Amino acid sequence: MTVAPLSTAFRSLVGLGGVFTSAKSFEDNPVLSSRWLNQAGLHAARVTWAHRVAVSRRARLAHLVSAEDRAAFARDGYILKRDFVPDFAALLAEVRSYRTAAREMIQGDTLTRKIALDRAALAAMPALRTLVESEAWRNLLAYIGGMTARPVQFIQTIATHINNSDPDPQTYFHADTFHPAMKAWLFLNDIAGDVPPFTFVPGSHRLTPARLEWERQQALIAAQARDEHTRQGSFRIDAAALAAMRLPEPAQFRVKANTLIVADTFGFHARGPSAAPAMRVEIWAYGRRAPFFPAPPRLPWPFGADSYRPRAAVSAFDPA
């Protein structure tokens, strides 16, 4: 046997193992991208199985949130809380004055900066530590994420129009992956003017027959898609496809500082439009676990370290 067949066989074995994990890249996995397997229902089966598990997980954690919040999430795919932090002024002052190492990434014309909420950061910012250790914060994130394990948490800065490159790819409506996942945003500045709002299609987190068929069709062509994010399993969607699924108009959240949004990012979402340079700063959390097991193990940090560059002694509110 030559080297090439051995390599192909090894990739197929690895790809087969990925079927039972959170693996989502059609470009990198010959099993997930197999047209024959997806015509036979592989992708649709993974999506369906993952959603059944997510429903079960959330049912076990339903006591953590109010009936009103559960109903809002079931209807919309997100929970919104205004004036969330009681002593918001203290938290904001801490974040503004805190300087440390950060990681930055540029996608298109937009910069994303992340400051890790590690032990040192939380020790230096007691009001922020109080927030992320509070039941109000943890319970909402746990319920939508379907897990009580602590999510990945950062101070995140979004700076728009920092160059003359292509548009930010996050401004296109998309689902993060094939299974339910949680993201949270506590906005530290008002989302107004040219500050890009979080945008979400209400109800698009639900696995309807129309959505499942759309997922099946996307899986047949994803590996050859022009869009790299689609090839990597974060499917993009246009207005015509949203309308075909009879989904409502997207909601743009132009909200005041101290507003929390926790959402299931299987739902279609995007970073809203920004016509001029602007900055958005938020406490950002991301929860993702292996989608097929009732007690999911922790997954590695999903974003490639090579896409970020280090930056020393920076504040979340510093310019790009």
Where are the predicted features?
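Double-stranded beta-helix
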Residues: 195-262
